[in-house]
Amino acid sequence: VNDTVDSYDNMISLCSQLTEIAPVCGVLGNHEDVKIYHQGDEELVKRFEDAGVKILRNEETSYSLYDNTVSVIGIEGKPEDFASYGAKECMEAQEAEDQYDLRICIAHVPTYFPEKLENYSFDLGLAGHTHGGIVRLPKLGALYSAEEGLFPEYGGGVYTLDNKATLIVSRGLGDSDKWPRINNVPELSVIDIN
């Protein structure tokens, strides 16, 4: 999503096309949170759902894919909200289930994982938010993230968490509303799970 504009038409069109290939689910980002919680725009969630996207708001869904049962849990908000809006209970409920072949956890803010989520059992974590650090420097990587400041640890890429889960932080497709991307190509992550 291009955060500098209010129109989500391009993202919703992309999501609609992706649902023709596979199930699509996701979580809201901070810009969507502002539109929904501060501006009362629940229509945005409806537009994503009408396009076939399941928006996970501290909830879990599961899919049967190629004889495997996949659990996807979506955690919204920031790490400091973890115990307030049902995210903790959602993670605990998923942890109690043992029928899943693959557990995926999605949280918009990557620091959610080391701060709150890596004590839970999941195989793959997905996040975004940092826009790849906006500016990327050769050999140093991401320059800045709102949560981590200069040279963020989770500026974009693949990481192994303490619980041995893989965390993929996408640089995403959109721009920041304050700075242009420099040396930081937008990305749409395609993850092949074997």
Question: Where does each model-flagged region fall?
Answer:
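Acidic/histidine-rich helix-loop elements
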Residues: 1-7, 32-42, 80-85, 139-151, ...
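Conserved beta-sheet core of the metallophosphoesterase superfamily
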Residues: 110-189
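Solvent-exposed loop/turn segments at secondary-structure junctions
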Residues: 1-3, 30-34, 61-63, 77-81, ...
